[in-house]
């Protein structure tokens, strides 16, 4: 089994998301989570439907306009402001199952690049009350930053998903980890692929 997955080999789904890793890629051994990439040119629209999945979209670089119907009617926001992942904290969109929204590449941004993470919500795996359909915008001021590890595995973690806890995400843990040059991300090497109560 190769752990090398090339984004260019991914299939494009109906929402225009390039699937990089998902449960249908049996060689990866994934059961619940999918990872993909979405890129929009300025002015290019894309309607996203979460279906039965919960979803987090992290703006890697550029800006997008988002439109959705909330509890009080039509909602609109501009998400993203950094040119790349090394230029500050991210913006993110967290959406619960049954949600629908439209993203449009912002006219001020020639291109917006996004990482898309999807999972079956926790209530489909265990008995757990699900979130109502909806969209939560996470702006950089909401993202907690912490240091983890020490010595050669010291890293900075920007925790995106805790800002949306209870508002759309029940299973996904989403964030960005920045390691000083030469450092490891964690020690000892490990993984988190089993549900524990």
Q: What role is predicted for each listed range?
A:
Residues 27-32, 47, 55, 65, ...:
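Fe(II)/2-oxoglutarate oxygenase catalytic core
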Residues 2-7, 17:
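Long, compositionally biased, intrinsically disordered regions
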Residues 68-98:
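Short acidic-glycine-tyrosine-enriched beta hairpin
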